[in-house]
Amino acid sequence: MLSRNDDICIYGGLGLGGLLLLAVVLLSACLCWLHRRVKRLERSWAQGSSEQELHYASLQRLPVPSSEGPDLRGRDKRGTKEDPRADYACIAENKPT
């Protein structure tokens, strides 16, 4: 017959093992759910890719390679000479700290 201390150790170990197993199952379920959601978002993103995104270079009015970004050939010519003080680097330099 086992002593009382041995029983506590056995049942405590089984309880902790059960909790660990439960945690692994819950984390696996969350990971599977997240994986399915990412796949669904990727599919919806691929279907919506017909709309062109703004390319960083187009936002800075820089030349954009023809394979990337929107076609800017027909844009308004007024906005090409912007105030250079509006550039992020200039704002960061002039910002009082």
Swiss-Prot record:
Organism: Homo sapiens (Human)
Expressed in which tissues: Expressed in lung, tonsil, thymus, placenta, kidney, fetal spleen, fetal liver and brain.
GO BP, sorted A to Z: anatomical structure morphogenesis; cell morphogenesis; dendrite development; immune response; negative regulation of lymphocyte proliferation; regulation of cell shape
Induction: By IFNG/IFN-gamma. Up-regulated upon autoimmune and bacterially-induced inflammation.
Primary residence: membrane
Name of the protein in its database record: Leukocyte-specific transcript 1 protein
Phosphoserine modifications at: 58
Membrane topology: Single-pass membrane protein
Biased composition (Basic and acidic residues): 70-86
Pfam families cross-referenced by the UniProt entry: LST1
Similarity annotation: Belongs to the LST1 family.
TM spans (from-to): 8-28
PANTHER family in alphabetical order: LEUKOCYTE-SPECIFIC TRANSCRIPT 1 PROTEIN
Subcellular location: Membrane; Golgi apparatus membrane; Endomembrane system
Record key words, sorted: Cell shape, Golgi apparatus, Immunity, Membrane, Phosphoprotein, Transmembrane, Transmembrane helix
Protein function: Possible role in modulating immune responses. Induces morphological changes including production of filopodia and microspikes when overexpressed in a variety of cell types and may be involved in dendritic cell maturation. Isoform 1 and isoform 2 have an inhibitory effect on lymphocyte proliferation.
